[in-house]
Amino acid sequence: MFIGYRCSRNRSCLDATAVITSICRYALPPRFGKHVVLSFPRRVIASGGGNDIAARFVAQRLTEAFGQSAVVDNRAGAGSTIGTDIVAHSAPDGYTLLVVHNAIAINQTLYAKLPYDTVRDFAQVALIGATTNTLVVNPAVPARSVKEFIALAKARPGALNYASTGAGGTAHLATEYFRLETGVNLAHIPYKGTAPGLTDVVAGQVQVMISALPGTMPFINSKRVVALATTGAKRSAFLPDVPTLAEAGVPGYEFDTWYGLHSPLPRRGCRRRCS
């Protein structure tokens, strides 16, 4: 589902090795005075959804590489700012890492004031990978293609609701992009994460959601939702029979979700002491 997973098993191993190598170079702390801090990454903070899956991928590799158990700590909410703030104010000792996605860049333009500085408070450790998103609907929605869904939405303007992971989040922006390109009128219902949004799609409280593939696949496989399209430049190997939105009648549409790894940077005073 991530970049490495779309390739062979050997390529996945290479990608995992690259991530661990980057962690060793950038996440592990420098010499503090006359002492070297030997704290290996053992806490990976995520914000749920696809971030949780990416974090578990990283935690498993960390455990294998360092022989010490690494745990995933999910801190969802407020457009990923809760977990991000925790890491920003964590000790820069190599113990804590943060899985980020598109929201780390989006939030700078969304919030007037953040409790952290996206540029100054973090070291960019590694790119974990990227994944496509999926446009899914409740099975009761009378549409089994994107064209049928667009026709239904235009026939019932404002009557269909879509879920997102919060205002300004990737699911929100991806769906607004879809609305802009197709001219449909959908009502926005923001949720506090992927799972609550998809749960209400299943329950029929909302009819549609565009969400990252890793978090959506269990719902698709269990037939609790119907996948109409993916948002990448090409079809997903995990859903080879599902067309891209560009193929399905929305030319030029492409919207991927990427995942990266950050670590906290020392505050200015600490950086001076470490130099």
Task: Give the ranges of each region predicted by the language model.
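C-terminal lobe and pocket-closing loops
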Residues: 130, 216-274
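A ligand-binding cleft/hinge motif common to bilobed small-molecule-binding domains
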Residues: 104-113, 172, 177-181, 208-242
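Residues marking helix boundaries in flexible regions
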Residues: 4, 21-24, 151
